[in-house]
């Protein structure tokens, strides 16, 4: 099975190499197809991600992305937000649990936080009112709110 691997920036390539080693050691039938994206790639090429990335994700149906950086003040669009919006991966699911043998201030935690991942400030509707005042619109639609509630 083919899958897209986006190593990303910073520690991303190291994490991605570990993922490749682990999946190989587990004898998983995954052929990782690598594409570059993120701040380092943008600095080199002026593009957010390597050509063909979106088509590959659509073809292979899934991707694993390492951490990517977004330079501040460059007009560079976040890879994370752009991919979320492109593929409508709207649910950010964060499970929280205690683990046996690990001390914690609180006991018996078993909680899942689900956050809408494509609207609010993620829409990127921002502009300067003056040289000293910026405005960011927190757009939230009924459609997206209903969708995340039903998730």
Please place each PLM-identified region on the residue numbering:
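Anion-binding alpha/beta catalytic cores of soluble intermediary-metabolism enzymes, centered on
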Residues: 1-10, 39-151
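N-terminal phosphate-binding or glycine-rich loops at protein starts, especially the Walker A/P-loop
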Residues: 1-36
């Amino acid at each position: 099975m083919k899958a897209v691997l986006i190593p990303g920036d910073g520690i991303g390539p190291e994490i991605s190499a570990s993922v490749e080693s682990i999946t190989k050691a587990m004898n998983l039938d995954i052929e990782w197809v690598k594409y570059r994206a993120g701040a380092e790639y943008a600095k080199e090429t002026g593009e957010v991600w390597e050509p063909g990335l979106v088509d590959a994700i659509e073809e292979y149906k899934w991707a694993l992305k390492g951490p990517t950086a977004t330079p501040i003040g460059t007009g560079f669009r976040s890879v994370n937000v752009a991919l979320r919006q492109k593929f409508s991966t709207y649910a950010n699911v964060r499970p929280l649990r205690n683990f046996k043998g690990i001390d914690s201030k609180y006991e018996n935690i078993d909680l899942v936080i689900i956050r809408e991942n494509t609207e609010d400030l993620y829409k990127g509707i921002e502009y300067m009112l003056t040289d000293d005042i910026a405005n960011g619109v927190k757009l939230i639609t009924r459609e997206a709110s209903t969708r995340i509630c039903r998730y």
